[in-house]
Design a protein with these regions (language model features):
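N-terminal ordered "arm"
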Residues: 15-61
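Solvent-exposed loop and beta-edge segments used for protein-protein assembly and interaction
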Residues: 24-26, 53, 72-74, 85-87, ...
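Short, structured protein-protein interaction patches enriched in aromatics and acidic/basic residues
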Residues: 52-83
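Helix-rich interaction surfaces within compact, conserved domain-sized segments
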Residues: 82-83, 90, 94-95
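Short, solvent-exposed aromatic-acidic interface loops
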Residues: 93-104
Length: 274
């Protein structure tokens, strides 16, 4: 019975979940790096994370046609760079998706601020590519890029690795930082101290990657999604291509005090008491 597994069923689930990695095959991705306002980053990054030396931010739109966990969906995301100790990663501010199981897995397991989008699209244009994310009737992200250069997968990995100080390898590893928490049933605080989760993803390009030093990214806020609070000061780099990505298991690296974190806990939900 699915509502109550027998001992054999429980054993199988435990075996399969132990160290499980989530794999995205032939992921079509448009990813950009830009400089934002350092004062904004200081305001929104919770301790023990610290703003990185440079006020970088990243955004992407992706289509996932095949995964090893049964979900086929589209996704958009927005991060600002932040450091934990000496490790630079991305503090995730928004990650709309088009599939409920992708939402549940990313949000409840790793703490990603996932919400269901109305529509997420990624389409080729005459000279490039265009991505869009619409949620609750508002286009939160509009991203377009004209192709300027094409490089082999190995060169793309080398260039991306240079951004994060990585040695050349088979793939580019990115760190995501998220805070995992749940409101208590009495709505007076949290069930437990909010936990800082570190999760690493390996990006492996498949074939040639299109690059551009210029792109157009428009971020817009709605009543429930404040993406427009992140200024796009200077476009730095954009890329488009097909990737085989692997999300590795995460780990809890810190806990924070409830009152210290409370101000940062309200962008994952739409309703804000007035």
């Amino acid at each position: 019975m699915r509502f109550a597994l027998d001992d054999e069923g429980v054993a199988k689930v435990k075996e399969r979940m132990a160290g499980m990695e989530f794999v995205f095959y032939d992921a079509e991705m448009l990813w950009v790096l830009f400089r934002t306002d350092p004062e904004v980053v200081k305001q929104i990054v919770p301790e023990p994370l610290k703003p990185s030396a440079e006020p970088y931010a990243t955004a992407f739109v992706a289509k996932y046609p095949k995964t090893n966990f049964g979900s086929v969906y589209n996704e958009a995301a927005l991060f600002v760079t932040a450091d934990y100790g000496e490790e630079m990663g991305g503090y995730c501010l928004s990650m709309p998706v088009t599939d409920d199981m992708a939402l549940i897995g990313g949000r409840e397991t790793f703490g990603f601020p996932k919400k269901i989008a109305d529509q997420i699209s990624l389409e080729k244009t005459e000279n490039g590519v265009r991505g869009s994310c619409v949620r609750r009737g508002v286009e939160l992200m509009n991203l377009s890029m004209t192709f300027e250069e094409e490089v082999e997968a190995e060169k793309a990995v080398e260039m991306l690795g240079a951004l994060t100080g990585q040695e050349p390898g088979e793939g580019w590893k990115t760190i995501a930082y998220n805070f995992k928490f749940f409101q208590s049933p009495r709505l007076t605080g949290f069930d437990y101290k909010p936990r800082l989760v570190k999760q690493v993803t390996t990006w492996k390009p498949s074939g040639k990657i299109k690059l551009s030093s210029g792109f157009n990214l428009k971020l817009k806020s709605s009543d429930s999604d404040p993406l427009g609070e992140i200024p796009v000061k200077e476009p730095l780099m954009g890329l488009y291509g097909i990737f085989n990505n692997t999300m590795h298991p995460g780990e809890v690296i810190a806990e924070v005090e409830e009152e210290q974190f409370r101000r940062y806990a309200h962008f994952k939900q739409d309703y804000l008491p007035k």
